[in-house]
Amino acid sequence: MIVTEKVKFISNWIKAYTDNMPNKAQSLVIGISGGIDSSVSSTLSAMTGLKTIVLSMPIKQKSFQHDLSMKHQEWLLKKFNNVEAHTINLDELFRAFSHSLSNFDNEHGFANPRARIRMTSLYQVAAA
């Protein structure tokens, strides 16, 4: 199977999966970081034709990382008319969280909460 066929196959599979849900999905929600995984996932989601909500959620991001996310967000908006894009800055929320646990400061320990805060934000948007 050539790449374009694989892309179409995966996008069609996502659409078929949502069509066969007991409560049919009205939209897809994807967090975008500017990395390859979220770029591919968000593009495949947009290709389904379903409303696709993409969220950039910076937490202690280096500017070049956030810039990649924003460039991909802009590209999606230009290429697909079913994409809705939002930036949710989670820096202040994470600062409050880490401050409340300042007696237990450990950079490795704080890596997982960043992912969980983003995950919770995705759940909230998807539930709305």
Show the residue positions of the predicted features:
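ATP-dependent adenylation/nucleotidyltransferase module used to activate substrates
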Residues: M1-A128
